[in-house]
Amino acid sequence: MISRIPHIPHTFIEFGVESYREANTRLLLKLRNWRGLVIDGSADYIQRIQSQDIYWRHFLTAECAYIDRNNINAIIQSAGFDGEVGLLSIDIDGNDYWVWEAIDVVNPAIVVVEYNAVFGDVQSIAIPYNPEFQRLNAHYSGLYFGASIVALIE
């Protein structure tokens, strides 16, 4: 996909990365030498990322923050990112829709957002915004989170 977009910036922002071992942007960093920002709410995960060779060998910034729609722009800007970016990846198992809607400090060429397939592909559904949202606290199954694909397309 990135090869089909002319003059795509070689920068990315990804949040909800956990240890960054299974991330949407990892190959862009390693194989294409993109510069990026990764964010996770767990200090342990961020410490793991910062101790990996991928962190010091590449242009990677790793920030520990619990993201909500009120702080996401400040987090992105304080890490030195604004304007055009190549890819934005959102996977926070909860307020993904609301956080994406709030982002206005970057303009990504490509956006990857986790959607909830349980909500189906017919109706526009998003969980109500709750800055304290925890997927497993919301419902024991862990299946109540995020938004339907229709909501994200709209």
What does each of the following model-derived ranges do?
Residues M1-S78, G83, L87-I90:
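SAM cofactor-binding core of SAM-dependent methyltransferases
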Residues L27, W34-R35, G83-I90, G94-E154:
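Conserved acidic-Pro-Pro-aromatic motif
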